[in-house]
Amino acid sequence: MSFFENTRKPVGFGGKIMVAMMNLGHSPVARWGLRFLNAAPDARVLDCGCGGGANIRRLLKKCPQGVVKGIDYSPVSVEKSKRVNETAIVEGRCVVLQGSVADMMFADNWFDAVTAFETVYFWPDLPRCFREVYRVLKVGGTFLICNEANGDTDKDERWTEIIGGMTIYKDTELKAYLEQAGFHEVQIHKKKSWLCITARK
């Protein structure tokens, strides 16, 4: 497995390095994307594909009286996320679990918001995963997707050649999948190659 395969599912020592790098490298696009999330101070938020936990930490700051849960299918990512958010976990404001977005262990209609930063590229069955997100969201809840790539450049295509199982979706494709899953009020925000999409249940 190449080092860059760790972007999909971090494993071993290389995976530990990768999640640390992603916490730093994805910071600018994540901060930009979070501007489009309107969440109450006491919101319940789920971060799918939580990686190294940096966005969980940002969400906890955005919702200081809320609860933030994270899910990732990489044990390395879960371990890192727990370390980064250890204080909030002890306080009962944060939970990080290992699992698949395609079959989540959460109750129906539980979250006020669900986020997915730099992760939908790797979801194996996007329609099914979007239906799962729809299931766990409350009516009126928001699903936010934030990506550094919108499939508009040759560089995007090169990444899909380097990293197995990676698909870079255009904003129009994501919008169509979201609407098929039942979402409405789909809004698309762009900044150069960056993409942020919000959708309502």
Task: State what each model feature region is.
Residues A102-A113:
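A short acidic, Gly/Pro-enriched loop at the edge of an enzyme's catalytic core
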